[in-house]
Amino acid sequence: MPLDDRKKKILYAVITDYIMTAEPIGSRTIAKKYNIGLSSATIRNEMADLEEMGYLEQPHTSAGRIPSDKGYRFYVDSILRNYINNDPPISYNTREEIIAEFDEIVKKYARILANITHHTTVAKMPKLNPDRIKKIQLIPVASNKMIFLVVTDTGIVKNYLLNLCQNVDRTIFEFLNNLLNEKIAGKSEKDIFEFLQQDLRQMLGEMAFIADELINTILLSLKQLQETDIYADGTSHILDFPEYKDLGKAKNFFNLLDNKSLLNEVLEPEVDFIDVRIGSENKFEEMKDLSVIKTTYKINGRVVGTIGIIGPTRMDYRKLISEINVMTKELSNLLSSIYNDEI
């Protein structure tokens, strides 16, 4: 049965008050604090109906009501409908004019989001196949040092510093750049391994002494490109919530953040917009008391990762949805502007 306007107002009042106080709320409090225009008795009857319909819960017989997961879901869906139709403008000045390591930019935005929201944030970095490597560049920084730069077809950059056992003439770098791009960029993992194991040393000739460093660095870059990295920030914010004053419950939360495989599944994008999972909607038992707000970030419209906020079900969904929406749009714009062109 759909909720009428009166029930909606009462449900929103209960949720708003509970988010602020973490205490069950009664009909008299709603009548006094919120301009609903109904008597305490009428509100009490409506709250009983909302409880029977599954939108509210009564933790103790003598206490007021608190929102259920179903109640939060109704509230969140109404917020998301507004955001689909009315995207807020980007307002945070967090842009940098330098090209930075991709992962570090994402981590910075996750850190900013944690500081703004006072919640724990988690970020998922992209997992890529070797044949997504678009370009390799060796940049000399000294006679015995070079930067090994990998650029993927989405523009994501990885860089590594190579310390060589001997000095290298700078004229060799053009040869190396051409060779590595010909043999690695756009090639399958099998072809790359065959080149490294069978051909590289021979092709380097008298420069074979740098083969070990190159092979180790290339293998490391391939390994890291295929790994899904999970980053968490603002982990201590959970202790600010009364629900997590219990040390056992707090410990379980920190153990959850250490479970990277679980977080990897939690952050797997399921919709191409803001996705909210509330309490029992989460498929993992460890997250039945938590809510997750997550959304993807993109490079030129292509999804490359996910950022999420994790906290108690009693969270300010309207504020947090707004914050994560703005921050991921800003992050996507920044990444697209930095990695739009070839380096």
Curated annotation (Swiss-Prot):
Transmembrane segments: none annotated. GO terms for biological process: negative regulation of DNA-templated transcription. GO terms for molecular function: DNA binding. Keywords: Repressor, Stress response, Transcription, Transcription regulation. Negative regulator of class I heat shock genes (grpE-dnaK-dnaJ and groELS operons). Prevents heat-shock induction of these operons. Belongs to the HrcA family. NCBIfam families: hrcA. This is Heat-inducible transcription repressor HrcA. It comes from Thermoanaerobacter pseudethanolicus (strain ATCC 33223 / 39E) (Clostridium thermohydrosulfuricum).
